[in-house]
Amino acid sequence: MESVCRGNSTVGSNPTLSANHITTPNVGGLLGGTMYWLFKEEPSSYSFEEFIKDGQTSWTGVKNPLAQKHLRSVKKGDRVFYYHTGNEKAVVGIARAIGSAYLDPADASGKRHTVDIVPSRKLRRPVTLAEIKADRKFAAFPLVRISRLSVMPVSVKEWAAIEFLSKT
């Protein structure tokens, strides 16, 4: 796992994701609209429950070049699935980017980016990697194809399917 430090300050309200955010085709970023992402974290390092308690965090410590490329693309208002790695291997919550990615001030190289996110809500039930792999709709999903990647895009269809699975 490549992520490091999480959890810093608190933010007042934590809006929830509404259904109308997943009804558009997967061109949101190209048209300046909402994009969808999945961020991975080891729950023993920084669980979604800790994130909720903190109210906000900066997503730091991402070293992989492709994950950094994705992180640099995150914009204010984008939605993020929070994924627990390790023994859990499941999407457990939803967060929202409160600003666009920016250079990580703690990175001595001056090349790595970070983004500030706030929790929106915990999923009704976690959606496991095994469930995702078992569903052919997710064949092209980076979580299935490039499993070690810690920051990845999520298509609108994948987002909607995971949301649906979390409610069943």
State the predicted function of each range.
Residues 30-76, 166-168:
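Compositionally biased, charged N-terminal/linker segments
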Residues 81-82, 96:
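Hydrophobic beta-strand signal
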Residues 33-43, 104-168:
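Contiguous surface segments at macromolecular interaction interfaces
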